[in-house]
Swiss-Prot record:
The keyword Hydrolase applies. It comes from Rhizobium meliloti (strain 1021) (Ensifer meliloti). Bidirectionally degrades single-stranded DNA into large acid-insoluble oligonucleotides, which are then degraded further into small acid-soluble oligonucleotides. One of its GO terms (biological process) is DNA catabolic process. This is Exodeoxyribonuclease 7 large subunit. It is an enzyme of class 3 (hydrolase).
Length: 526
């Protein structure tokens, strides 16, 4: 018998499968929270995924909800989400049945008031300032007259037109525009790439390297200018090797790139004015400097002329300057004749001293000595030949004796010895003949020198040698006294003579004058 309590009664509660229940919850949640606005702090943000979607969470002090921003929505955001930023997200809540999770799909995102953004900017500013990126010592002066200006901005806005127009009015230079987006997704990356790209240009390349950079954007809200507060952009501006001018927004708009730039311009037009000077002002200044230089040069020339006149008046006259040199010249000219006479006398005395060493008896003795040397050499040569002949005869005798013992073996040696003796004899005769020729040549040369230095050659030219009674040559007129017996030697003989008084000579027949054009036979002693 079955108990009443053991039987199962049907329940009034509907039964669902897990999928049905999850789908019902999903529909209920999406219908109830189809459009919501949620305030919270971004947590776990790591930037967009490789697919372009962004995943993070919104949290407050007691709860947390996952959030997703699809790729198309992320591209339309006015600013990039950042970790710790308080935002207001607008979207719809949905669930994910596979893991029983719910999340908000964000359609728009905005900062939760300007105060939150300013607090984030201040926190980032303190961090970068602590690293020294905003130090005044890092900032470089702008070039006075750049040749190339690089501009990083949007190519379609009014900003680039204002910059180009202002540069053309002030000082036309070469402007290179690097087109970028200045707002929205990817704007920060493009501006950073432009700054780094300009710095990567090499001087002298196909694209000229700018001398100064301008990063410019027009005015806008804090959200519109948010990319210029990006940490990567601030670091790129601080690391730029090219001086950089920031011109973001209006004069009251300040971004972090303004603190890292070398100069901050209140407007893009002001940046163009900072980059290039006014050409007309430079020309006027140059003309003023040229006029001042011309006046200074004229005054300097006048001063120099006055100084030159004063110095000229203080200088002595030309006659005074030349008086002493003229006197020295006259004295030198007067002493020139005396100097020539003294020099001639000195040369004559030197000649007489040297002539004394060329006496005939010395040359004769030298020739005799050379002849004796030649005879000695001839005798030595004859003895040498005689000894060689004797030694050859001895060798022949020895060879003859040996030949008797060994005729067949020594016949060749005898012939060779005989040839060697003959060769030695010929060589000895040739050597003796060569020595005799050389000695005869030297003796002939000495004889020619003796003949040239002999006084007979002088007598041959028409001169006479005067000797006293002892036969000694008379060298000076002072050694001759009246009545002194003299001997006059000519080239063809000698005659006796007596010296007259006071140097007068006995009368001689008048010599017939030489015919005109007939050369005289009288030679010159010198």
């Amino acid at each position: 018998m079955t108990s009443f309590f053991d039987s199962e009664s049907p329940s009034n509660v509907a039964e669902y499968s897990v999928s049905e229940l999850s789908g019902s919850i999903k529909r209920t949640v999406e219908q109830a929270f189809e459009h919501v606005r949620v305030r919270g702090e971004i947590s776990g943000y790591r930037g967009p995924h490789s697919s372009g979607h962004a995943y993070f969470a919104l949290k407050d002090d007691r709860a947390r909800i996952d959030a997703v921003v699809w790729k198309t929505t992320f591209a339309r955001l006015k600013f990039r989400p950042e970790e710790g930023m308080e935002v207001i997200a607008t979207g719809r809540v949905t669930t994910f049945p596979g893991s029983s999770k719910y999340q908000i799909v964000i359609d728009s995102l905005e900062p939760a008031g300007a105060g939150a953004l300013m607090a984030l900017i201040e926190e980032r500013k303190r961090k970068l300032a602590a690293e020294g990126l905003f130090d005044a010592g890092r900032k470089r002066p702008l070039p006075f007259m750049p040749r190339v200006v690089g501009v990083v901005t949007s190519p379609t806005g009014a900003v680039i037109r204002d910059i180009l127009h202002r540069i053309a009015d002030r000082f036309p230079v070469h402007v290179i525009v690097w087109p970028v987006r200045v707002q929205g997704d990817g704007a920060c990356e493009e501006i950073v790439a432009a700054i780094e790209g300009f710095n990567a240009l090499q001087p002298g390349g196909s694209i000229p390297r700018p001398d100064v950079l301008i990063v410019a954007r027009g005015g806008g809200s804090l959200e519109d200018l948010w990319c210029f507060n990006d940490e990567a952009m601030v670091r790129a501006a601080a690391a730029s090797a090219i001086p950089l001018i920031s011109a973001v927004g209006h004069e009251t708009d300040w971004t972090l790139i303004d603190h890292a730039a070398d100069q901050r311009a209140p407007t893009p037009t002001g940046a163009a004015e900072m980059a290039v000077p006014v050409k007309a002002d430079l020309e006027a200044q140059l003309a003023s400097l040229a006029a001042r230089l011309k006046g200074a040069a004229a005054r300097q020339m006048d001063n120099r002329r006055q100084t030159l006149r004063s110095l000229a008046r203080a200088l002595p006259s030309l006659d005074q300057l030349l008086a002493l040199p003229r006197r020295r010249f006259d004295e030198a000219a007067a002493g020139l004749g005396r100097g020539l006479q003294m020099n001639t006398a000195n040369k004559r005395r030197s000649f007489e001293r040297n002539a004394a060493h060329l006496r005939p008896e010395l040359l004769t003795a030298r020739i005799v000595d050379r002849r004796q040397r030649v005879l000695d050499a001839v005798n030595r040569a004859e003895r040498i030949v005689e000894r060689k002949v004797q030694r050859g005869a001895q060798r022949i005798s020895s060879a003859d004796a040996s030949l008797r013992v060994l005729p067949s073996r020594l016949i060749g040696q005898i012939h060779r010895a005989s040839d060697r003796v003959s060769s030695l004899g010929r060589r000895g005769d040739a050597a003796i003949a060569a020595d005799l020729r050389r000695m005869k040549s030297a003796l002939a040369a000495q004889d020619r020198v003796l003949q040239s230095l002999s006084y007979h050659s002088v007598l041959q030219r028409g001169f006479a040698l005067v000797r006293d009674a002892a036969g000694e040559p008379v060298k000076q007129a002072a050694a001759v006294h009246p009545g002194m017996a003299l001997s006059l030697e000519f080239a063809d003989g000698r005659i006796a003579a007596v010296a007259g008084e006071d140097g007068t000579a006995p009368q001689s027949p008048k010599k017939r004058p030489a015919r005109s054009g007939e050369p005289t036979k009288q030679g010159s002693l010198f």
